[in-house]
UniProtKB/Swiss-Prot annotation:
Keywords, comma-separated and alphabetical: ATP synthesis, CF(1), Hydrogen ion transport, Ion transport, Membrane, Thylakoid, Transport
Protein name: ATP synthase subunit delta
Record flagged with keyword Transport: yes
Disulfide bridge positions per record: none
Organism: Crocosphaera subtropica (strain ATCC 51142 / BH68) (Cyanothece sp. (strain ATCC 51142))
Amino acid sequence: MKGSLFSTEIAEPYAQALMSLAQSRDITRSIGEDCRSILDILEESAELREFISSPIIKDEDKRGVLNRLLGNDIHHYLRNFLMLLVDKRRIVFLQAICEQYLALLRKLTNTVLAEVTASTELSEGQRRDVIDKIKALTGAESVELKTDIDPDLIGGVIIKVGSQVFDASLRGQLRRISISLTGAS
Protein backbone atom coordinates (compact mmCIF):
# COMPACT_ATOMS: atom_id res chain seq x y z
CA MET A 1 0.00 0.00 0.00
CA LYS A 2 3.00 2.28 0.26
CA GLY A 3 2.60 5.34 -1.89
CA SER A 4 -0.87 4.47 -3.13
CA LEU A 5 -3.40 7.24 -3.68
CA PHE A 6 -5.80 5.55 -1.26
CA SER A 7 -3.31 5.49 1.61
CA THR A 8 -2.25 9.07 0.87
CA GLU A 9 -5.85 10.26 1.03
CA ILE A 10 -6.33 8.59 4.40
CA ALA A 11 -2.91 9.60 5.73
CA GLU A 12 -3.15 13.29 4.85
CA PRO A 13 -5.72 14.41 7.46
CA TYR A 14 -3.91 12.45 10.18
CA ALA A 15 -0.56 13.95 9.17
CA GLN A 16 -2.10 17.43 9.14
CA ALA A 17 -3.62 16.86 12.58
CA LEU A 18 -0.24 15.71 13.89
CA MET A 19 1.39 18.78 12.33
CA SER A 20 -1.19 21.08 13.95
CA LEU A 21 -0.51 19.50 17.33
CA ALA A 22 3.25 19.73 16.83
CA GLN A 23 3.04 23.38 15.76
CA SER A 24 0.88 24.30 18.76
CA ARG A 25 3.51 22.78 21.07
CA ASP A 26 6.52 23.99 19.03
CA ILE A 27 7.77 20.41 18.57
CA THR A 28 7.57 20.04 14.77
CA ARG A 29 11.23 19.09 14.35
CA SER A 30 11.20 16.69 17.30
CA ILE A 31 8.14 14.90 15.91
CA GLY A 32 9.84 14.89 12.49
CA GLU A 33 12.90 13.14 13.92
CA ASP A 34 10.65 10.60 15.62
CA CYS A 35 8.77 10.00 12.35
CA ARG A 36 12.10 9.38 10.58
CA SER A 37 13.02 6.86 13.29
CA ILE A 38 9.67 5.11 12.90
CA LEU A 39 10.12 4.96 9.11
CA ASP A 40 13.60 3.46 9.59
CA ILE A 41 12.19 0.80 11.93
CA LEU A 42 9.34 -0.01 9.53
CA GLU A 43 11.74 -0.22 6.61
CA GLU A 44 14.00 -2.64 8.49
CA SER A 45 11.24 -4.88 9.83
CA ALA A 46 8.78 -6.53 7.48
CA GLU A 47 7.57 -8.48 10.49
CA LEU A 48 6.54 -5.28 12.29
CA ARG A 49 4.79 -3.95 9.17
CA GLU A 50 2.81 -7.18 8.91
CA PHE A 51 2.06 -7.16 12.65
CA ILE A 52 0.58 -3.65 12.76
CA SER A 53 -1.30 -4.25 9.49
CA SER A 54 -2.91 -7.50 10.58
CA PRO A 55 -6.62 -7.25 11.38
CA ILE A 56 -6.33 -10.51 13.34
CA ILE A 57 -4.01 -9.09 16.00
CA LYS A 58 -5.79 -7.40 18.90
CA ASP A 59 -5.46 -3.65 19.36
CA GLU A 60 -4.17 -4.11 22.90
CA ASP A 61 -1.35 -6.31 21.55
CA LYS A 62 -0.46 -3.68 18.96
CA ARG A 63 -0.42 -0.97 21.63
CA GLY A 64 1.78 -3.13 23.83
CA VAL A 65 4.30 -3.85 21.08
CA LEU A 66 4.45 -0.21 20.01
CA ASN A 67 4.94 0.92 23.61
CA ARG A 68 7.68 -1.66 24.21
CA LEU A 69 9.38 -0.97 20.88
CA LEU A 70 9.24 2.82 20.95
CA GLY A 71 8.80 3.41 24.69
CA ASN A 72 10.29 6.69 25.78
CA ASP A 73 12.32 7.01 22.58
CA ILE A 74 9.59 9.11 20.95
CA HIS A 75 7.77 12.21 22.15
CA HIS A 76 4.78 11.38 24.36
CA TYR A 77 2.43 13.32 22.05
CA LEU A 78 3.46 11.08 19.16
CA ARG A 79 3.13 7.96 21.31
CA ASN A 80 -0.44 9.03 22.23
CA PHE A 81 -1.10 9.73 18.54
CA LEU A 82 0.03 6.18 17.67
CA MET A 83 -2.34 4.75 20.28
CA LEU A 84 -5.15 6.80 18.71
CA LEU A 85 -4.25 5.32 15.31
CA VAL A 86 -4.50 1.84 16.80
CA ASP A 87 -7.89 2.66 18.37
CA LYS A 88 -9.20 4.10 15.07
CA ARG A 89 -7.78 1.11 13.17
CA ARG A 90 -5.59 3.42 11.10
CA ILE A 91 -2.22 2.17 12.34
CA VAL A 92 -1.94 0.30 9.03
CA PHE A 93 -1.33 3.74 7.47
CA LEU A 94 1.50 4.64 9.88
CA GLN A 95 4.17 4.66 7.18
CA ALA A 96 2.10 6.89 4.88
CA ILE A 97 1.21 9.21 7.77
CA CYS A 98 4.87 9.61 8.77
CA GLU A 99 5.90 10.22 5.15
CA GLN A 100 3.12 12.78 4.74
CA TYR A 101 4.09 14.51 8.02
CA LEU A 102 7.70 14.79 6.82
CA ALA A 103 6.50 16.26 3.51
CA LEU A 104 4.49 18.86 5.45
CA LEU A 105 7.51 19.59 7.65
CA ARG A 106 9.74 20.07 4.60
CA LYS A 107 7.21 22.50 3.14
CA LEU A 108 6.97 24.38 6.45
CA THR A 109 10.75 24.70 6.78
CA ASN A 110 11.47 25.34 3.06
CA THR A 111 13.43 22.10 2.86
CA VAL A 112 13.71 19.96 -0.25
CA LEU A 113 14.16 16.20 -0.30
CA ALA A 114 16.94 15.19 -2.66
CA GLU A 115 17.53 11.57 -3.59
CA VAL A 116 21.21 11.18 -4.42
CA THR A 117 22.56 8.06 -6.09
CA ALA A 118 26.34 7.70 -6.22
CA SER A 119 28.77 4.96 -7.18
CA THR A 120 30.36 5.07 -3.72
CA GLU A 121 29.56 6.55 -0.32
CA LEU A 122 29.81 10.36 -0.41
CA SER A 123 32.43 12.00 1.77
CA GLU A 124 31.36 14.82 4.08
CA GLY A 125 32.86 17.36 1.66
CA GLN A 126 30.98 15.83 -1.28
CA ARG A 127 27.74 15.88 0.74
CA ARG A 128 28.25 19.59 1.48
CA ASP A 129 28.97 20.30 -2.21
CA VAL A 130 25.82 18.44 -3.30
CA ILE A 131 23.72 20.26 -0.68
CA ASP A 132 25.13 23.65 -1.75
CA LYS A 133 24.42 22.88 -5.41
CA ILE A 134 20.84 21.80 -4.63
CA LYS A 135 20.24 24.94 -2.54
CA ALA A 136 21.49 27.06 -5.45
CA LEU A 137 19.29 25.23 -7.96
CA THR A 138 16.11 25.19 -5.86
CA GLY A 139 16.38 28.22 -3.60
CA ALA A 140 15.61 26.01 -0.61
CA GLU A 141 16.82 26.98 2.85
CA SER A 142 17.89 23.43 3.63
CA VAL A 143 18.22 20.05 1.97
CA GLU A 144 17.38 16.59 3.26
CA LEU A 145 19.56 14.01 1.52
CA LYS A 146 18.49 10.45 0.94
CA THR A 147 21.48 8.59 -0.44
CA ASP A 148 21.75 5.34 -2.34
CA ILE A 149 24.78 3.49 -3.69
CA ASP A 150 24.82 2.12 -7.25
CA PRO A 151 28.26 0.82 -8.31
CA ASP A 152 27.02 0.64 -11.94
CA LEU A 153 27.21 4.45 -12.15
CA ILE A 154 31.01 4.09 -12.42
CA GLY A 155 31.47 7.63 -11.07
CA GLY A 156 29.56 10.84 -10.39
CA VAL A 157 26.04 11.23 -9.02
CA ILE A 158 22.40 11.31 -10.02
CA ILE A 159 20.33 13.82 -8.05
CA LYS A 160 16.54 13.71 -8.02
CA VAL A 161 14.63 16.64 -6.51
CA GLY A 162 10.89 16.31 -6.96
CA SER A 163 10.35 15.53 -10.64
CA GLN A 164 13.71 16.97 -11.74
CA VAL A 165 16.64 14.63 -12.36
CA PHE A 166 20.23 15.85 -12.67
CA ASP A 167 22.42 13.10 -14.11
CA ALA A 168 26.08 13.91 -13.51
CA SER A 169 27.15 10.27 -13.56
CA LEU A 170 29.79 8.77 -15.81
CA ARG A 171 27.24 6.18 -16.94
CA GLY A 172 24.88 9.00 -17.95
CA GLN A 173 27.62 10.83 -19.83
CA LEU A 174 28.57 7.63 -21.69
CA ARG A 175 24.91 7.05 -22.56
CA ARG A 176 24.55 10.62 -23.90
CA ILE A 177 27.73 10.22 -25.97
CA SER A 178 26.44 6.91 -27.34
CA ILE A 179 23.11 8.50 -28.28
CA SER A 180 24.79 11.43 -29.99
CA LEU A 181 27.13 9.09 -31.92
CA THR A 182 24.30 6.82 -33.07
CA GLY A 183 22.20 9.85 -33.97
CA ALA A 184 25.07 11.36 -35.99
CA SER A 185 25.56 8.29 -38.18
